[in-house]
Amino acid sequence: MYHSAKRRSSSRLMMFIIALIIFIFGLGLNLSVGASDISIIDSLKYLFVWDGSKEQLIISTLRLPRTLIGVFVGASLAVAGALMQAMTRNPLASPQIFGVNAGASLFVVASLVILPASPYSSVIFAFAGAAAGGAIVYMIASSGGMTPVKLALSGMAVHLFLSSMTQAIIILNESGEDVLYWMTGAIDGSNWQDVITIAPFSVIGIGLALVFSGSVSVLGLGDETAKGLGQNMNGIRILISLIILILSGASVAVAGPIGFVGLLVPHIVRKLIGEHYQYVLPFSALFGAILLVYADVLARWIAFPYESPVGIVTAIIGTPFFLYLARKGRNLK
């Protein structure tokens, strides 16, 4: 048993090192790809050595903020998805499928129409919309007994309804073209203000998730077992819900509703390292950042020299996976 645990620990360490190398290479690749070709080595060098060149200005003012937004948004959505799947014990749970992203998007778009644009007001409205979307889904799914498939279907119905309301606002708004592009999930055009906006929420949210990862693992044991272990289940669920709202709301506010990151990444992580959330959450953050960084690179390559929203790439990757899980969901109890 000791040797088995030691092997698992060594396997996780090796996997973390490999993932970290892939992540660092992805950062360099993300900084180097664009209209101006810059080598990966030079891209990483310009982060530490200032020479005032045009290439360095491109990286420092355009590509580095965009890359950091990809890291923060990818990590935040992946951790939010892992927390939702743990709290609901539903493998189909994610911020997009449960109406959280759609609610946040609706409130943000409505605020942009009514109020002057402000990054922090957008975050506040995103939090409120995420909470409203999640609450509506929970109320619908819990009536008459909640099941994983019922929860997923309720989430998709609310997601479609809220998304249609958002589309209606965009159509009726004269300046809706820019908002429509944001709705596809886009991080191109990100700036340092966006980084400053999301960074504290992402760091605090992921930090809290890691601190309470042990309690998250207990949720998977069922309410009776968790109560027997002295856990306050209602308190844990409220705390996890707040963390999910922080991570999802901040991500939507700066990047739009990017889908499938929160669904795809936790499944991959659990397949690789097991069900213990002390490991699932930090690996989800790392894998989520990797997914969105590389998806952003693909978004620049698909229609080069034009750029596609990164949300389109994650949808192409995630849709077949969601259909696979939904098909398996017929057998979920």
Curated annotation (Swiss-Prot):
Topological category with respect to the lipid bilayer: Multi-pass membrane protein
Primary localisation category: membrane
Matches recorded under InterPro entries: ABC_BtuC-like, ABC_transptr_permease_BtuC
Molecular function terms, GO-annotated: transmembrane transporter activity
GO terms classed as biological process: siderophore-dependent iron import into cell
Domain of life: Bacteria
TM spans (from-to): 13-33, 67-87, 97-117, 121-141, 151-171, 201-221, 238-258, 279-299, 302-322
Gene Ontology cellular-component terms listed: plasma membrane
Location within or outside the cell: Cell membrane
Keywords: Cell membrane, Ion transport, Iron, Iron transport, Membrane, Transmembrane, Transmembrane helix, Transport
Similarity comment: Belongs to the binding-protein-dependent transport system permease family. FecCD subfamily.
Function: Part of the ABC transporter complex YfmCDEF involved in citrate-dependent Fe(3+) import. Involved in the translocation of the substrate across the membrane.
Subunit structure: The complex is composed of one ATP-binding protein (YfmF), two transmembrane proteins (YfmD and YfmE) and a solute-binding protein (YfmC).
Protein name, UniProt field: Fe(3+)-citrate import system permease protein YfmD
